[in-house]
Design a protein with these regions (language model features):
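Secretory targeting and sorting signals
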Residues: 2-32
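Surface-exposed loop and turn segments in beta-propeller and other repeat-based domains
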Residues: 81-92, 135-150, 190-208, 244-269
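Short, Gly/Ser/Thr-enriched beta-strand-loop segments that form substrate-interacting elements
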Residues: 306-312
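Short loop/turn segments immediately following beta-strands, especially the blade-tip
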Residues: 122-131, 186-195, 240-248, 252, ...
Length: 354
């Protein structure tokens, strides 16, 4: 496998992550520097039911709905059509049909099936406007499920491998247990096999010590970022390194302790509860549920941020950079914890005026 050269921004982020794991003598830091920014929105589609993830099949947007387990495709006018459903999904609480990803004509899904979360793939059949789903093929089973902390974000990295975030499912100790799939970021081939260069031989575990990570994205230099729900003290943005230990449940937020990698940015949960993230241009964008805002973190200075749309559209579950370079945000007010409006839930095109 070819290795990507790391540019200045990726090197800066990696250096900051290394600083966070080695500088353990300093006192824990507080919240990062934040400013308010202005943005406008345009509605792409309405009437979604507890939507969780957006992915693209070519230029066609696909949306997952957590509770109905449906996959929807959107046409150019924003009208939604059901492609199919992910059979066997049995959620409850935070479980259900969660993340989706598309690769080589297949839809990959992460869904709760009773006592476990599983990753499956199905061929996307027919053409845009009449897409269907083929038979399921199981990629990975045995990820512990619970009414809380299921993780659930999946994405293909620039190395062509599939990454998945898993929560601790309320079993705190599992996050530090490298034989468990819970509380991890996993890395696998498209068939679910262990890549030869994974940091732990014979293991899908790429990083560990996570509580409930729900966002993963890469910058142009191949640096991996992840957002994570903390408990009561700090939510996090992390730069992920292979084999890294991110501390949960021993630490939360920037603790400065030996052996644990600190986040590059942290926020109080009331202002955050970060879910899906996307890299667009020179920034990481983070959707926030409880915080009801879109947060921008510049790659060149990941200890600062700008906040948009605060309180304007309610809970935000996902943010994606579209094939044409637009930025979309997915609201999540029908998930049982929000106050849905008459058109919820929606996908919004976000314009930062640049």
């Amino acid at each position: 496998m070819k290795r990507r050269r790391r540019g200045a921004r990726g090197a800066a982020a990696a250096a900051l992550a290394l600083t966070m794991v080695t500088a353990c003598s300093s006192a824990p830091a507080g919240e990062s520097s934040t400013t308010a920014g202005a943005a406008s929105t345009e509605t792409i589609t309405t009437g979604l039911d507890a939507p969780w993830s957006v992915a693209f099949h070519g230029g066609t947007p696909l949306v997952s709905e957590r509770d109905s387990a449906r996959i929807l495709e959107l046409d150019t006018a924003g009208s939604a059509r059901e492609v199919g459903s992910i059979g066997g999904t049995a959620g409850g609480g935070e479980g259900g049909l969660l993340g989706i990803a598309v690769q080589d004509g297949f839809l990959y899904s992460y869904a709760t099936a009773g006592e476990e979360n599983r990753i499956e793939r199905r061929e996307l059949t027919r053409s845009t406007g009449s897409l269907g789903l083929g038979l399921p093929e199981v990629i990975l089973t045995g990820i512990e499920a619970a009414p809380i902390h299921n993780g659930g974000r999946i994405a293909f990295g620039p190395d062509g491998l599939l990454y998945a975030t898993t929560g601790d499912a309320g079993n705190r100790g599992s996050a530090q247990d490298t034989t468990s799939l819970s509380g991890k970021i996993l890395r696998m081939t498209a068939d679910g096999a262990v890549p030869e260069d994974n940091p732990l031989p014979g293991s899908l575990v790429y990083s560990y010590g996570h509580r409930n990570p729900q966002g993963i994205a890469w910058d142009a230099e191949g640096t991996l970022y992840s957002s994570e729900f903390g408990q009561n003290t700090w939510d996090e943005l992390n730069v992920i390194t292979a084999g890294g230990n991110y501390g949960w449940p021993e630490v939360e937020g920037i603790a400065g302790r030996n052996g644990f990698i600190d986040p590059v940015q942290q926020w109080k949960p009331v202002d955050a509860s970060p879910s899906g993230i996307a890299v667009s241009g020179e920034s990481v964008f983070i959707s926030n549920l409880r915080g009801e805002r879109l947060r921008e973190v510049p790659l060149a200075d990941p200890r600062t941020s700008t906040e948009y749309l605060t309180g304007e559209h309610g809970r935000l579950r996902d943010v994606v950079s579209t094939p044409d370079g637009s930025l979309w945000a997915l609201t999540n007010n029908t998930d049982g914890r929000g106050g849905p409006g008459p058109d919820d839930d929606r996908i919004l095109r976000v314009d930062l005026g640049r």
